[in-house]
Regions:
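Bacterial N-terminal signal peptides
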Residues: 6-15
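Short, glycine-/small- and polar/acidic-enriched structural segments
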Residues: 23-122
Length: 122
């Protein structure tokens, strides 16, 4: 898993642009500092930064308003990565809900942190 995370972020960072020898800075938008996603983003950045001399990528974690904020900020080009729940990724890609007037079909998932099954009670 550790190598998958480093490889995925490094590959995506290189795809963003810039020479491999130059230092590339990336940010991961997460959620509130008291939630689960902020420490998860911090752990990903620690893994990336541990081997930054090999790939030239420096990672920083940012506390944000969560999934919708992260998606919109990535779309605006202000974040390179963001943690988003899969239902909001679906809405962003397909255009319903908050994204009805402004879908984001270019959004891509790099990895899944954990499964999020849910129960619908009617």
């Amino acid at each position: 898993m550790k190598h998958l995370v480093i490889g995925a972020v490094a590959a995506a960072g290189l795809a963003i642009g810039g020479a491999a020898s130059a230092q590339e800075f990336i940010s991961i938008g997460t959620g509130g500092v008291t939630g689960v996603y902020y420490p998860t983003g911090g752990a990903i950045c620690r893994l990336v930064n541990k081997s930054r001399k090999e790939h030239g990528i420096r990672c920083a974690v940012e506390s944000t308003g969560g999934s919708v904020y992260n998606i919109n900020t990535i779309k605006a080009g202000e974040l390179e990565f963001g943690v988003a729940q899969s239902d909001w990724q679906y809405h962003a890609y397909n255009g319903p809900s908050s994204f009805a007037d402004n879908p984001f079909p270019e959004i891509r998932a790099v990895m899944s942190v954990h499964p999020e099954p849910f129960t619908l009670v009617v």
